[in-house]
Structure formats: C-alpha cells, structure tokens
C-alpha cells in the first residue's frame, strides 16, 4: 500500500496528502478536526538561489501580493540579498539579506491558497538549516506573529514592529533590533 501511495504522490505537481484510515473510523476522519487516520504527505520542492539569480521576479512579486494583500515596492528587487528560498510553483518563498549585524529575513511568504499546507514550515526548515542565527520583523497585526513567537529565541515589541531573533549572540541583539526598526518598508 505504501508503494501505491508513493507512486500517487510522485505524480502530482504540488504537495498533496493521502490519509490512510480504518473504514470504521472513516466518518470521524471526514467530519472532525481530530482525524482518525494517518496522513502521508509529499513535501514540496524548494529551490535555493544565491541572491536574485534565476528567480522569476514577476512570479515572486505576484506571490508577495497574494500573501500580503499589497504590492512590493518597485525597488525591492534592486536591493542586494544573500539567498532566496522559493517553492517550485512560487506558492511560498523566503528572502534573506546579509547585514553588518547578522542575516536578516526580509520576506517570508506563503500564498493564501497554500497557507495551512505545511509549506511555510518546509521553507522555514531550510532557512534555519542555512542560517542558524538571524533576525526578522513582523507587523503586530500579522496573523503569523503567534507562529513566529514559537520559532524565535527572543522578541521585542514596538508599536509598529515586533522584532524577532534566533541564535543571535546577546551582544548582537541590540544592533539587530536597531537595524530592523530602521529598515525601509518593502511595500509601496
């Protein structure tokens, strides 16, 4: 049975899940939040690019518009970045810039239709693999802020921004917070 599931998942373009459930528990699986089966899921292919090289900027711009509900600034792609992590169908991405302080996660986005699929966690695991120490910011009203709180080692709350960090030495936290507060907006 696992071989059949593997073949099925290999032939679909996006991440997809298959639930294996006992027939007696089928209704519970369908109609409750706490399912009764075992979920088997194919992961997404995440491409890692140095800088903006080989990134389809138009598709990335569309992803940001879908995820954030507003357009990215025209000069966003002229800013230097160290690495971009992009799901093969541009349903999710992360952008990391090098700063004088530490790596800065400037964008982390999953398109609205893919939110809840685990894609963000897949991208996040690659970012944290490549960057064990970095910082980022989020608007207080951002719905993902509570997830960020679980991922960070620390945070400071300001009226306009919440500043998060992970793996930073204590002497770097102050300069990282100052950098994040001073960074210009990515949206027009």
PLM feature spans:
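Conserved active-site alpha-helix within GNAT-family acetyltransferase domains
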Residues: 140-163
């Amino acid at each position: 049975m696992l071989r059949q599931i593997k073949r099925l998942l290999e032939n679909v373009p996006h991440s997809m899940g298959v639930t294996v459930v006992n027939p007696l528990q089928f209704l519970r699986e369908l109609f409750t939040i706490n399912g009764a089966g075992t979920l088997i899921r194919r992961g997404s292919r995440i491409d890692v690019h140095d800088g903006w090289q080989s990134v389809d900027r138009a598709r990335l711009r569309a992803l940001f518009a879908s995820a954030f509900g507003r357009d990215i600034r025209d000069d966003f792609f002229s800013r230097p970045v160290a690495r971009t992590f992009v799901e093969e169908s541009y349903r999710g991405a992360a952008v990391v810039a090098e700063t004088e302080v530490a790596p800065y996660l400037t964008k982390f986005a999953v398109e609205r239709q893919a939110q809840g699929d685990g894609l963000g966690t897949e991208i996040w695991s690659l970012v944290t693999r490549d960057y064990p120490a970095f910082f980022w910011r989020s608007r207080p009203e951002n719905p993902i802020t509570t997830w960020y709180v679980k991922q960070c080692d620390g945070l400071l709350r300001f009226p306009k921004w919440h500043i998060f960090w992970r793996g930073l030495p204590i002497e770097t936290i102050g300069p990282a917070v100052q950098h994040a507060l001073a960074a210009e907006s990515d949206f027009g």
